[in-house]
């Protein structure tokens, strides 16, 4: 057992075991960061249309969304350690197939990559919930999500260099490295063999849990907020570079760098500030949604505000950094233990669905209007989510006192 484990077998979020967790998360998501750059370039060079490229890239998130609840079901049946071993093997095989296959196979391989990601994120977050003290849970989830974001700052630069070099050997080396290293680090990672659920969770039980979303105000409101927010995040990630190139008023590279740095700094510096007692903080969530709204509205006004648009990166980065770990930590406390991971899987699916819709639905809006109109609609989505949070304030905060007394 890790030397930093306490008498109850719980670990410290900065212990050696959890540093391995975070490194594993970085390596796993580095593969997607690389493929997100290289696959569209390869596909376009091979003659695929923009619609075909969009379908191929969207297959990743869509498969993720569909399989998260199933991943949670298998966690309860087989335990995080066994599921982790299976998914790392699947991940490695998928990357090797990317190396060997041509563009016609990319759609199915992206879907297969989405399968591995659905299981990976559920398994990692189950491990954090099971292995950390309640008071450290928010810090652990924040650090985990931080390390899933870092590859998006570093790996794309490497991927572009590989593409521009036109040497297939470097792509092969990258894929082999990103297939082998997670296996070496993660195959024996310190994951629990069983979860609190610790039971075989049948499909009937899983569909019964789906109905619970309408009966559980915390799950319903959290999922709705995440759906709206991730739609905004997805639209920004998909269309911001095209928007800035088309207007010529700002640099997408500078904007994304500022946003990425804000995300990393917030998730590290503020990791201990995220509520880790199961309490709902209405004004924190509303404030994050306000930041998201300000960020997209400044983008909508890009042609009028010029360089001031980089403030949008700060607002958007702040919302992006704290929204997901805050809501995930809250739900990990309030959901029933016997179906916690299936219900959390449904919540995470709302993120995947929103992100996908941000590219698909907002793309249709751009085609029929303008980028400015699309970002204004994103602002309205954030405002609607903020109104939901305020309207349901009393119901969401009704259990705060009881959970705080239990925590103390």
Region spans (language model):
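Juxtamembrane intracellular "pre-TM" segments in multi-pass secondary transporters
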Residues: 2-15, 190-222
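Helix-loop boundary and gating motifs at the non-cytosolic
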Residues: 12-56, 218-225, 230-243, 255
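Central cavity-lining transmembrane alpha-helices of secondary-active solute carriers
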Residues: 58-71, 257-269
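Helix-to-loop junctions at the C-terminal end of transmembrane segments
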Residues: 67-79, 163, 266-280
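Structural signature of the two symmetry-related core transmembrane helices
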Residues: 82-96, 283-297
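Paired small-residue
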Residues: 104-113, 307-315
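Cytoplasmic helix-loop-helix junction between adjacent transmembrane helices
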Residues: 111-147
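Symmetry-related core transmembrane helices of the 12-TM Major Facilitator Superfamily/SLC fold
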Residues: 171-186, 375-391
């Amino acid at each position: 057992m890790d030397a930093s484990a306490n008498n109850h077998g719980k670990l410290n979020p900065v212990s050696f075991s959890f540093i391995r967790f975070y490194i594993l998360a970085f390596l796993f998501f580095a593969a997607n960061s690389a493929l997100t750059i290289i696959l569209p370039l390869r596909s376009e060079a091979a003659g695929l249309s923009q619609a075909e490229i969009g379908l191929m890239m969207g297959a990743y998130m869509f498969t993720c969304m569909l399989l998260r609840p199933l991943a949670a079901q298998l966690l309860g049946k087989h335990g995080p350690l066994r599921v982790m071993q299976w998914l790392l093997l699947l991940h490695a095989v998928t990357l090797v197939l990317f190396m060997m296959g041509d563009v016609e196979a990319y759609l199915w391989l992206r879907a297969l990559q989405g399968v591995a990601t659905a299981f990976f994120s559920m398994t990692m977050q189950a491990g954090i919930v099971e292995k950390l003290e309640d008071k450290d849970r928010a810090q652990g989830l924040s650090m985990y999500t931080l390390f899933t974001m870092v590859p998006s700052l570093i790996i794309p630069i490497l991927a572009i260099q590989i593409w521009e070099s036109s040497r297939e050997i470097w792509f092969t080396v990258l894929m082999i490295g990103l297939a082998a290293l997670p296996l070496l680090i993660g195959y024996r990672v310190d994951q629990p063999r069983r979860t609190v659920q610790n039971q075989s969770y049948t499909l009937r039980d899983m569909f019964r849990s789906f109905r619970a979303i309408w009966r559980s105000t915390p799950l319903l409101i959290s999922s709705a907020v995440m759906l709206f927010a991730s739609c905004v995040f997805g639209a920004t990630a998909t269309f911001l570079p095209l928007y800035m190139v088309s207007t010529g008023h700002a640099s997408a590279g500078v904007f994304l760098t500022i946003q990425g740095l804000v995300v990393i700094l917030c998730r590290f510096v503020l990791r201990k500030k995220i509520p880790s007692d199961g309490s709902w903080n209405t004004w924190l969530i509303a404030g994050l949604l306000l930041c998201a709204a300000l960020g997209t509205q400044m983008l909508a006004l890009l042609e009028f505000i010029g360089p001031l648009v980089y403030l949008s990166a700060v607002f958007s980065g702040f919302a992006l950094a704290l929204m997901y770990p805050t809501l995930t930590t809250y739900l990990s406390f309030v959901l029933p233990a016997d179906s916690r991971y299936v219900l959390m899987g449904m919540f995470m699916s709302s993120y995947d669905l929103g992100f996908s819709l941000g590219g698909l639905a907002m793309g249709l809006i751009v085609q029929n209007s303008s980028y400015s109109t699309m970002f204004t609609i994103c602002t309205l989505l954030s405002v609607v989510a903020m109104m939901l949070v305020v309207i349901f304030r009393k119901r969401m905060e009704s259990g705060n006192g009881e959970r705080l007394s239990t925590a103390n």
